[in-house]
Every structure is written in structure tokens, then in C-alpha cells.
Amino acid sequence: MKLNVNLPDHPYDVIIENGALANIGNWVSSLWKKQKIVLISDNHVNGLYGQKVVEQLEKSGFEVETFEFPEGEASKNLLTAEKAWNFCAEFGLTRSDGIIAFGGGVTGDLAGFVASTYMRGIHFLQIPTSLTAQVDSSIGGKTGINSKMAKNMIGTFTQPDGVLIDPEVLKTLGQREFCEGLGEVIKCALIADKALWNLLTDLSAKDLLENFAKIEEIIYRSCEVKRKVVVDDVLDNGVRLYLNFGHTIGHAVENTAGYGKVMHGEAVAIGMVQISKIAEKKGLMPLGITDEIRKMVKKYGLPDDYQPWDEALLFKALTHDKKARGTIIKTVIVPEIGTAKINEVTFEEMKEYLKK
């Protein structure tokens, strides 16, 4: 399966294929001339696949070094980025060379940020290995690192030269890590694809883990939602905000819990349920939709709430949300399954929203 992210200034393809990782050398050769490559990966993914990937790239004529960092959201910071910049410089990476992000969402965000800022920007590729990264963060060009104040506070919009998705690598994920990625899949269904919602209704996490043909289809449909929105609004000023359904409260939960304690897809699930509950009470979403969303997230092993629910800490995190404009936060609601809408909320109203 192939999708084309047809951006006027930087079009690229997303390849989705079981077993695609075994052909990585040919894929990279089709996009880049023989050059130096820095493979950026965390210790877990690098331990599983790194040596084979490097061997294939070297066999195809590339000179490769690997920058490895400790697994987890806590590594997505300026210190790790600086270490990566220095690593690239010591290897002699120039603007005609490239970086490959090989790992989950943390790796993709970090490596993309490093590539977009090293020497004011060099080429990079995305090879996502988590479900969250495959269906969401690897497409669209958002890169970033966290600060103490907020998730992804420092970042750029920089598109990759290509994305290679191999669903088979998901077999090495634990059940929590796999289900976490389904938070973003459910979000895609809610904002833009009712047929995907119906498919998720008919399946279960067990079905998906046992049938990778179904996983390939679900990844494709989710990526198509992301592709359409990105092509229409590359810089996140309009319809691309729809992709943030559940993220306003979700990012606040991640921040207050401490990065990594609540996984991103889990936080999105919590955020979708909580914002829907508020919007339903205010008549902005239809009666009963919150229960439908809650039922779906719980069916796929995701949380619908977070404790302790500290309104003051959550509100403080929300004030640093990237969707804030002055004292207004642009939240996303779902008027019906398969559609989305922007709802502007003041900070004061948001305080009320957070009260239980």
C-alpha cells in the first residue's frame, strides 16, 4: 500500500507493507544517493533491529553510524538533541547527508527536530516502529522536544523525504504499547472516518494482534486521514487542528503525570472522553456520544480517566498549549462520529471544563 503526501513544496510517499523493513536498503537507495547516514534510535529498538538495518544500508553503499539514546519520553529534550547534533558533527555529516528516525514517536519527533536544525536543516526519513508513530506522528512534518513547561513546546515543521511502515515490527510490542497506539486510531475514526469506527466496533485488540492484514488496513485508513488533513493545512492553522481531538486535556495529563508515566495514546483516550463529557453537557455534542467513546477506548484497553485529577496543575499545563491564541484555546469536538469541529474556549471557561 502506498499513500502520497502531495505537498506542493515537498511531496513524499508513505509505504505500508508487511515485511518492508527487509528491503530498507533498496528503499533508501531509491530516495537518496550514496552518502553518510546517522540512524537515530533508542536503546530498545536499536537492540532489536539496529544491527540488521545498518548492515542492509551498508550493503547498499551507505556509510552509517547510530546515535542511540535511552528509551522513553524523558529523553525527548534539549540535552539529547545537543548530544545528537554533536554526534552528527563528529561523524562529519554535511547538508548532502541524512538522518533516519528509526523508532517510535519519541524517536521520530527527536530525530526530525535534530535533522531540521542541524546545519539549518538536512534530509531525513521516518521508519516508525510503534503503532502511534505509524498512524500519526511519522506523517506531516511536526518535529519537537519537550520542555519542563509543556510537551512539544520546542519544534519545527519539516517534512521527511519518505515514510516506511512495516506493521510486522508491531509484533515485538507489549500489549500496553500496542493498545496505546489505538488511541490515535480511534481519534482518526472519530474525526474523519466513520467506516473505520465501524471496523473498530466489529474487531478487538486480540483480533488485530492475531491478524496483521487487518492491522495493515487500519494503519492505511488512519494514515489516509492524516494525509488528507496535512495536505489541506500543513502548518496547523485550520483543519489540521482536528487531529488534536483529545490532545488539549491529553497533553495536560501527560505533563502533570510526568512524561512517560501516562503513554501518549492513553492520554489522548482520556482527553477524548473528558472533552466529550464536557461538550455533551454543554449541548455541543450529541447525547450518548461520550458513552460510545468511553466504551470504545475501554474495549481496546485504554483508560478513560486519570487520578489524581488536579484541576490547578492541569489548567497550568493547558495555558502553554500550542493551540492557545491569547486567552483563547481552540479545542476540537465531534458533532457526530466521523466529523470534527473547532470550538473556541476562553481560559476561564477551561477552568470550568476541568471541574469534575
UniProtKB/Swiss-Prot annotation:
Catalyzes the conversion of 3-deoxy-D-arabino-heptulosonate 7-phosphate (DAHP) to dehydroquinate (DHQ). GO terms for cellular component: cytoplasm. It comes from Lactococcus lactis subsp. cremoris (strain SK11). Zn(2+) binds at residues 184, 247, 264. Binds 1 divalent metal cation per subunit. Can use either Co(2+) or Zn(2+). SUPFAM superfamilies: Dehydroquinate synthase-like. Pfam families: DHQ_synthase, DHQS_C. This is 3-dehydroquinate synthase. GO terms for biological process: amino acid biosynthetic process; aromatic amino acid family biosynthetic process; chorismate biosynthetic process. It catalyses: 7-phospho-2-dehydro-3-deoxy-D-arabino-heptonate = 3-dehydroquinate + phosphate. It is an enzyme of class 4 (lyase). It is found in: Cytoplasm. The keyword Nucleotide-binding applies. Belongs to the sugar phosphate cyclases superfamily. Dehydroquinate synthase family. Its EC number is 4.2.3.4. GO terms for molecular function: 3-dehydroquinate synthase activity; metal ion binding; nucleotide binding. Its cofactor is Co(2+); Zn(2+); NAD(+). Disulfide bonds: none annotated. NAD(+) binds at residues 71-76, 105-109, 129-130, 142, 151. Pathway: Metabolic intermediate biosynthesis; chorismate biosynthesis; chorismate from D-erythrose 4-phosphate and phosphoenolpyruvate: step 2/7. The keyword Oxidoreductase does not apply. Keywords: Amino-acid biosynthesis, Aromatic amino acid biosynthesis, Cobalt, Cytoplasm, Lyase, Metal-binding, NAD, Nucleotide-binding, Zinc. InterPro entries: Dehydroquinate_synthase, DHQ_synth_AroB, DHQ_synth_fam, DHQS/DOIS_N, DHQS_C.
